[in-house]
Amino acid sequence: MDNATILVIVTILLALCFDFFNGFHDAANSIATVVSTRVLSPRLAVVWAAIFNFIAAFIFGTAVAKTIGAGMVDVNRISQAVVLSGLVGAIVWDILTWWWGLPTSSSHALIGAYAGAAIARAGFGVIIPHGWTKTLIFIVVAPILGMILGLIFMTAMFWIFRNSAPQNVDALFRRLQLLSAAAYSLGHGGNDAQKTMGIIAGALYADGIITKHEFSTTWGHFHWPIILGANLAMGLGTYFGGWRIVHTMGSKITKLKPIGGFCAETAGAITLFTTAAAGIPVSTTHTITGAIVGVGSTQRLSAVRWGVAGKIVWAWILTIPASALVAAALFWTIRWFNPSA
């Protein structure tokens, strides 16, 4: 086995590690509300989310994978060291923010780290501006859209069930929240499941294992082991690390009842369905946080713990530049030992 093959295997394993930490960090968003409302136990919620994350891989196509793999940086100017540095940089940032209990975006950590390593190797000219434009716009738009939809849905539910007995409403939405949690998990899988595949395709192209033509046409033809491995890694990550972020998302921002959980998840799911179809790698964290804030604000503004929300916003702002710096430092370290990297 030659060095190039070993390096590709290491890259794929790191990509699966990133998926694990994505589950560790991001997939908890899929179950935060259904757990905080006590509709499902954390363990059952993880299984529920994992099933629909897996199904999503076959529903939404690979538009997001194409954006991540070929739409953010010029792949003709990167190397295997860039891909490795990007993956490790994203993982390091995810571990740090998980430890701090901050629900930042693994998606934005990945693209920030990937870009940071690419810039460290080839300068700012390696960036593809139009690929970044829609992503940066939706850093702002996604949580606002989630918040507006959450506010609208919650207001509508209050009006529709204004004369119903609270215990009957609670019982109904405990059942409906299983559907909304499934829908949100589908949206999460549709946006996140393809990101690692895009990175793997970029790594194969950077190492010359696939041609430019194969790289540009490979998005609909990923092998089953890659799909299964990516989803399994994400599910395991959710199982082992999800609750720390679930606690912040589901209870520290605002108190939720089943009706609120249903509205937040539905608002988040609609946002994720739309962006996945458009190939925009939005943050599931940003989306569900905005939806939870929108739902909580229908009670009264003081129902939202704005101090916690403010810390989350600062984490959002820092994610892309911080992960980029971490990855750039890693790349420069590699280049110190291997000037041709």
Task: Give residue spans per PLM region.
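Multi-pass alpha-helical transmembrane bundle typical of ion/small-solute transporters
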Residues: 1-341
